[in-house]
């Protein structure tokens, strides 16, 4: 038996020509397999700022895949959509907004696969969001 180091990918939007924003098992599987081929042992599929229906679709796919035996998926990473517009880089501006508990609480309560969520601390509502998220075993970045 050999023990070798492996990478834990905490921020990956896809791989092998597939994007996690496609929200399908085929896309998730293709991207994850590509990462595994090059030494990744565990991964947090990352979504760019997106709509709530897209987050829910990706979370459903992620939940199914995390339940598979020996799944390398540790949880879903949401990069936004609670970001500062001036610092949002390549994010889709129409999806950027301030944290709203009427939006994020149902997402968190319904989708336990979400484990990382990026948010800008200077936004209105961000302090409340920042206090709520760690209570749910998230990494807030």
Feature names for model-found ranges:
Residues 36, 67, 134:
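Anion (oxyanion) recognition and catalysis
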Residues 1, 58-70:
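Short amphipathic alpha-helices and their capping/turn segments at secondary-structure boundaries
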Residues 55-57, 86-92, 129-130:
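Short acidic, glycine/serine/threonine-rich loops at helix termini
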Residues 14-19, 84-91:
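A short acidic, helix-capping loop that chelates divalent metal ions and anchors anionic groups
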Residues 32, 56-63, 104, 130:
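Generic structural signal for well-ordered alpha-helices
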